[in-house]
Amino acid sequence: MANPTSRTKADIDRRRRRRRRRVQIIVIYTAIAVCLAWFFESQATTTVIFVRHAERATQPVEDPGLSEAGRQRAAELARQLVDADVVPGVGVDAIYSTSYRRSIETANPVADALNLPVLMYDVSDTEAITEAIVKEYKGKIILVVGHSNTVPEMIANMGASKNVPEISQDEYDNIYLVTIPWFGKTKTIRLRYGEPYVP
């Protein structure tokens, strides 16, 4: 006849082993879930917002700043982009501009509103800046202020639409949203802001 005490000890040991296994399984699954969450967060969709600089002044001829209409458009751009994400307190993470006054003055109201610096890029090497943005800002929102000839080129460099229509010399109201998912096809959306362009 078996000793009742030994059966109880065996049952207790078995229960402890089961409990230990359950805890180990929970810890392993939690670690896997945390790793997967980190992976998917680090691979999140990158959004690049491209705009052409706002309306430029006629003087000085060399490197004009913005006209009054351009300053109003830049202020409207800032108003729209301050809360670019639906999550409160989340918006544009970085702002890039060429070194031309009209581009910097277009970017400044957004930079001031978000307390971000305006980072300069070389207008003659659009491929380098688009590569750098994709590498450095994965899962972020970036504003890039360019020119009528560089915006379509940079959008194409991102692997997005190569069919962006030519931007007219008097056309300043386009916002191009390029979304680069960690998996899937890069998309381009064109929106309008400020006073509409009338051809």
Locations of regions flagged by a protein language model:
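Active-site-proximal alpha-helix that buttresses catalytic centers in soluble enzyme cores
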Residues: 2-39, 43-137, 150-199
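Conserved alpha/beta-hydrolase "nucleophile elbow" surrounding the catalytic nucleophile
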Residues: 147
